[in-house]
A protein has these predicted regions:
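PRPP-associated nucleotide enzymes
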Residues: 1-85
């Protein structure tokens, strides 16, 4: 389980923490910023190179915004050279 990294999108932080507690893992460090023009910026704050990355997101209203947060987070993990997402 050394190569497993679990990250939370903003609406799923509590749920992700429960998963990490159950698996005895630390939740991954990630920064989600939302600009005034509604653009999102995600930065993964730890190394995920060659790791299996799990991104937890809930799909509660507003659904479109939640899906975009998830897709942008997936893109950030891909750009950080995650092995599997």
């Amino acid at each position: 389980m050394n190569n497993i990294k679990i990250f939370a999108c903003p609406s799923a932080e509590k749920f992700t923490q429960e998963i990490c507690d159950y698996l005895n893992l630390k939740i991954g460090k990630i920064s989600h910023l939302k600009f005034k023009n509604d653009n999102n910026f995600v930065q993964i704050l730890e190394t995920v190179r060659q790791s299996d990355v799990y991104i937890i997101q809930t799909v509660e209203p507003p659904v479109n915004e939640r899906i975009m947060e998830l897709l942008i987070t997936i893109d950030a993990a891909k750009r950080a050279s995650a092995k599997n997402i």
